[in-house]
Amino acid sequence: MRTDNRTAGQLRPVQITTGCLMTAEGSALIKVGNTHVLCAATIEDTVPPFLRNTGKGWVTAEYSMLPRATAKRTPREVTKGRPSGRTHEIQRLIGRSMRSAVDMSSFGERTLIIDCDVIQADGGTRTASITGAFVAMALAFRQLIEYRALKANPIRDYVAATSVGLVGGIPMLDLCYEEDSQADVDMNVVMTGGGKFVEVQATAEHSAFDDAQMAELTELARTGIAQLVRMQKEIIEG
């Protein structure tokens, strides 16, 4: 039994609330256990210079954490003058994950920006951000269709993410902060609704792992992501 009384293959309680921001084209507040992330999607009628006059759009993301999202206050990165390497890595991961699910040639020269702001952190902030960001993005594209600015939905597939790890030699799904800090191996997995991998980030923190352990962890992640995609579908498709 784990610190929060879950079984090894059990997700934390997940709740996704939409329409949290009346000013955003799409928004979702995702709660994965005690990790809470507010995701907001904005659509702008412009694209980066490398896409001008191509007829293609772009999807990108920004990620940040409130100072008291963590047990000890973390200073705002704006006071340091630039985002940290960790922040750059996470927001690029979110952007790549969203682009994997979208046909960039089907929504014109527009940019969809997803802001992911961590309100409370207890492990898995990047994976929660990806799962919530997809919902916000889907709602933003739906609004374009309702306003007749788009004829077809640019989304090709769903995308969601979760963490897995080896804690005390036991494969576990959806690690909280305490488990993550004790893990021998931790892994973040992003997959499509069709079961294809978008990204796998795996690190041996205290001991190396073999092919069989990696396969076991990715399959465990697959079961969790399938549950998350079902939740997304219930929200988006009603």
From Swiss-Prot:
Q: Does Membrane show up as a keyword for this record?
A: no
One of the GO biological process terms: rRNA catabolic process
- The residues that hold phosphate are 86, 124-126
Q: What class of enzyme is it?
A: transferase
Q: Which InterPro entries match?
A: ExoRNase_PH_dom1, ExoRNase_PH_dom2, ExoRNase_PH_dom2_sf, PNPase/RNase_PH_dom_sf, Ribosomal_Su5_D2-typ_SF, RNase_PH, RNase_PH_bac-type, RNase_PH_CS
What does it catalyze? tRNA(n+1) + phosphate = tRNA(n) + a ribonucleoside 5'-diphosphate
SUPFAM superfamilies, per the entry: Ribonuclease PH domain 2-like, Ribosomal protein S5 domain 2-like
EC number(s) stated in the UniProt entry for this protein? 2.7.7.56
Q: Which domain of life is it from?
A: Bacteria
Describe its function. Answer: Phosphorolytic 3'-5' exoribonuclease that plays an important role in tRNA 3'-end maturation. Removes nucleotide residues following the 3'-CCA terminus of tRNAs; can also add nucleotides to the ends of RNA molecules by using nucleoside diphosphates as substrates, but this may not be physiologically important. Probably plays a role in initiation of 16S rRNA degradation (leading to ribosome degradation) during starvation.
Q: Which family does the UniProt entry place this protein in?
A: Belongs to the RNase PH family.
Complex formation: Homohexameric ring arranged as a trimer of dimers.
Q: What is this protein called?
A: Ribonuclease PH
Organism encoding this protein: Solibacter usitatus (strain Ellin6076)
